[in-house]
Each structure stands twice: as structure tokens, then as C-alpha cells.
Amino acid sequence: MAADLNTLKQDLTRRMDGALETLRREFAGLRAGRASPALLEPVRVDAYGSEVPLTQVGNIGVPESRMLTVQVWDRSLVSAVEKAIRDCGLGLNPQTEGQLIRVPLPMLTEERRNELAKAAGRYAESTRVAIRAVRRDGMDQIKGHEKKSEIGEDEAKTWSDEVQKLTDHYIKRVDDALVEKEKDIRQV
């Protein structure tokens, strides 16, 4: 039965890791004070008759802390890339120089920082909910094993404690990531 506990923990760990990875991707899209290529990664460009990720039509660079650049590989796509960046909803104003697009990042207002911090909090809370759902599923599996008399009451308690420790660990990681992101957002 010990192997079953390990299998259960591995499954729950994999699923909780997935929730944490989703949070990291969502946080990467929240623009803080510094430039990061992750800011433009979700941008999709109308190219070759379909929408493709920006990373498939050019290189994203960070020449300085408040500037991103996009080196577009195909000259015919420069205006489409510029339009996609302008329309992505991040309030960016790209400037084109040949096949290089410069994207200066404006200073964040206090109001915008508060909005970003609230969004980060919402992302963190939805991740906590996802982790708790994984925990609930694990607890249900343990109860199922106990009902089928596959494990005893003491073993079920031990397993439940292990699942709770795992859940607490991941919730703490979410909280730590949120504190770090809020600090990043509020940094002037």
C-alpha cells in the first residue's frame, strides 16, 4: 500500500505543479516596471492567413530596462506586428525603424499598479482554489480506498496528513509568488 501513497502523492504533486505553472504564466503577462520578453509572448499576429504567436515571426529583445524590441524576420509583416502590439491591450505604443520595432514601456501610474496587484491577487486565489480541488480529489480517493477496506483507518489518517502537508506546501508557494509579484509591481 505504501506504493499507492507514493503514486497518489506523485499524481497530486504533478497536478499542483501544473496549477503553479499556470500562475507563473499569468504573472508573466502582468507588466511590472521592468521590461520582460514574456510581456509580448501572448501577442498574436495576423500572418500568412492565420494568427500566429509573435515569437514565430520575430525575436523579442530587452535592450534596456524600460524598452522591448522586436526584430521582425519578414519585412512584409512589420506593420501587422506593430498593429498586434498596439492592439494587445497593454497600452503599448510601438515605434518602427525598418524591421526593428521598439516598444517603450511607459511608467505605471499608482492606479494601474493597484489594478495589477489586484489582478495578481485574483490569479493567486484561483490557483489556491485549483490546489484545494486537487487536495479534495486526493482526500476522496483516500476515503474510497478506506471504504473498500484497501487501507485501514490509521493508514487513511496518515495519507490524509501527507496530502494536507503537500497542499500546505503548495499554498505557501502560491503566497510567496504573490508577495514577490506584488513587490515587483509596486517597485517604482
From Swiss-Prot:
Localization of this protein: Cytoplasm
This protein's record includes keyword Plastid: no
Sorted UniProt keywords: Cytoplasm, Protein biosynthesis
GO MF assignments: ribosomal large subunit binding
Primary location recorded for the protein, binned into one broad class: cytoplasm
Annotated InterPro entries: Ribosome_recyc_fac, Ribosome_recyc_fac_dom, RRF_sf
Keyword Kinase: no
Gene Ontology cellular-component annotations: cytosol
GO BP annotation list: cytoplasmic translational termination
Protein purpose: Responsible for the release of ribosomes from messenger RNA at the termination of protein biosynthesis. May increase the efficiency of translation by recycling ribosomes from one round of translation to another.
Family: Belongs to the RRF family.
Protein name listed in UniProt: Ribosome-recycling factor
Organism: Granulibacter bethesdensis (strain ATCC BAA-1260 / CGDNIH1)
Gene transcribed to yield this protein: frr
